Amino acid sequence: MLVFKASALLFVLLSLRKEAEGWRQYEESIVEPGEVQDNRHEFFLEIAPKLSMSIERAYKSIAIVDFNPDTGGWEERVENQLRPCGETHVIANTTTPLGQSFFQNGDDFEELVQQHGLHSRVPSINGDYPGKTLVVMMDTEIVVRVRNSQLLNSLTARIHGLDNRWYEDGEAYVQQCPVAVRSEHVYRWTANRQGTMIFRAAFPSFGPINSFAALVVVKRRNERLAVGGGASLPIHAEYMMAIQDWPFVPANQQRAGHEMDGLGKWGLGLDRDQAACTLGAQIYGQRDPRVHAPAALVLNGKGWHNQTDVLLRPSVLPLATYRIRAGNNTLFRIAHIGFDSGVRIHIEDHELMLAVADGTHTIPRRIDAIYAFPGERYNFFITGKQNPQKRVYRIVVQTVEKFPTPDDRWLPIFGLANLEYEEEVAQNEAILDEVDWNQRKCAQATSSCVIANCPRPLEGRSECLSAGDLGFPDDHDLKDILKQKVYDEDEFEEHFISINQKTKVDGYSYKSPSNIPFYSNHTRTCADDPCNKRAVAEGRAECRCFHLKQFGLGKVIQLVLFNMGPEREGEAAREIPFHLRNTHFFLVKWAGPEYAADGQTIRSFNRDIRCNNPEEGCFGGGWADSSWSRGNVGGMSDSPPLRDTVVVPYGGYIVIRFRATTAGWFMAESTRSSERQSGVAFAFRVGSNDQVTRPPPDFPTDCGTFEAPPLSLEQREAVFRTVNM
């Protein structure tokens, strides 16, 4: 990984071609931050369209590339129109399945973006997709000049995980105007959180294919791994692993085809083979035709579109490969940058030591696997085996949902990466394609597994750690907001919020305001429009409006988010990955529904929340036990984790707390693209407009809806005279 050097000259010296890293046989370890000048890091990021599986030739001509798993060769299509249509020539071959030396001529591939192995236009960052990892020091200023070189799309940018000024959080028409094509916008963020963050540039911000780059904030150089009890371990290698579920067609088209046009049967594309009609997904045993299989799971920009190849011959595929040494500690920074599916991650025959979630420490725990949902970030490390039994182990990622296969089975979509030992280890090539897909250890009667961040109980003997079980071991000065007590009304606010796939947020589907509210005398909100919420719950109506909530500046804010509501045939119950932008919160309670004796079937919604008639939407919920009001919540965690993204379990609820210290306009949203697009979001203002920090004088504000005022009599007469001259 190449780290940008902080320099004022960076803005004018970076060239797109020199900065692109392209395809690499081995993933590069994250290196130390670049030089810090005047306590800031500066970056230039150009967002431009790029065709995956292509390479650039002389004079900016593009050559189309394909990988052939039958031969293990990279082939270039012959562009001469006088030659046969399917003619290709081989430009690189593999050597052996273990030493995948794909590129004899590395210059040919210095800009190759692989993704799912097919040809798609992606919004690259300085020629790479995902963009290169940015590494900065804690408590420094991050100056990012974003240039929008896309052909058609505007964009905004934000850092998912930092808590900064409200007008630099990138929500179009709430916090800033979109950056127009061929325009630039300079963002200034403060690295006030340690850990793994996500730089995201897109418009709308919940688009299924955004521009992404990881941002790593470190406290000190040569950091060590905290393992509890004041002990620490050296880090010998440190890798980024960005995970994407890649769609066949853009997720917004899938959603529109099902909900608006009734074309869900062809959710994988109208022009695909007739045998490719979708049957939807199986989610926790329920069928849902609205959820479509991703084309691939892509790890660090490398995946493969054909699941048969992934399952039967992974050794010949061009996968992300991470190198490790026996006995060494290797840190993985996981970021789910995908659009819809939650995933489960495990590494063959290796335990994971979970250390960080969403940029904050967790209580160190040894786990066997972890679930990650869109927007979540986790750090875990593994210790290399002293005597590895094979040279290559597999990192296995699979979707939470299951999808139909040609032989009438239901299986997850799988993605793979290689964990390769640098030592010379004898490898039986006959078992190169054998993969421990479902972690045999977890199915054995003599052992059990520990799985972190489970959205619901698991089958078998596995121990499930919910998001609320991860803890926060660091000392902090916010313990006063974590007490189980009745708080005074002038220091505490409690908000009950219904968040559900079917009824969205409190029955409202979010719509952007017509102008940036800070500059508007009156912004029309959901409170200005009548809404038949019973019709919403029954699926007969939609209340789409600017949903705004008000939080008091300086107060302790408690949000009780409950995922309960009507059940409809053909719509599976799903957890909601919830993100509170620009704000870290304490997850003081995570509570699921009540399950039947099998531990899988939901018997009833959690009875802590008052919801007498779920079919009418559970709006206006409250505590069933009124003594829990104003902060006196029963069953609170003794050591609640500090998060910015967490799943709200179906049939259950979460309780989060934070102190509202920064006045401004902010967003809360589902990070699942289909839900965000359909309106699972709300805006909130902390403080009054008089308390909100005003953006700089030249901050762009001329966007949104403009309605010309009526013409005066004199103006109409002037127009009439001009027309009749």
Describe the role of every protein-language-model region.
Residues 2, 10-27:
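N-terminal signal peptide
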